[in-house]
Amino acid sequence: MKKLLTLSLAAVAAFALQADSMFRSDINCVKEQNELTVKSDNMKFDRQSWIKDKAVHKYTSTAWTGKLGEDWQTVSYTVTPSKSGNININMMEQWAKTADTRGWVLVDNIKINGELVPNGDFKKTWKSKEGKVYPAHFWLNHKAQYIPDGGKDGSAAILVNHDNSGHYTLKNAEAGKAYTIQFTVKAAEAPMD
């Protein structure tokens, strides 16, 4: 009986893991008034339509995957800014109606135009005065976490979801230049509190 219950719970957990996790990446350049041209590679994309002022939608993008499974996959989208400057790239999981149905995603690395961004493999870290570990050049909100061995082949990774996102700033992006932003991701379990 215990074995049957254990197998049933494992099956439910695996289904929940795959059913709820969809990686999402947002860029918002409203403050900079930097119009973005966005092209889908293997992610769906749109503007940030939840922003009420439709006139600023052209300064935003949101790209997301379909449901992720337990295998690592590489996903990407391409953005071209109309002005030179910094571009903030947010990494999260897709929104769901309730917090407990918002899945979690592991991000193994981030590349731009085929090159690993500075510390895009999350190897270098720093610790806040509160003791939270962050990958150098990245910011982790709330319960987003650095996982030293959570990546592909035991490398470092970050764990994110919709309310607990990771952030990276592409510095000095050039106007009119296309930037293909690539992530290696997979579905993950929620962190232990």
What residues fall within each predicted segment?
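Extracellular and organelle-lumenal recognition/adhesion modules and their flexible linkers in secreted
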Residues: 20-193
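Hydrophobic h-region of N-terminal signal peptides that target proteins for export
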Residues: 10-17
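Sec-dependent signal peptide recognition
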Residues: 2-8
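A ubiquitous, low-specificity "background" feature that marks scattered single residues
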Residues: 8-9, 114
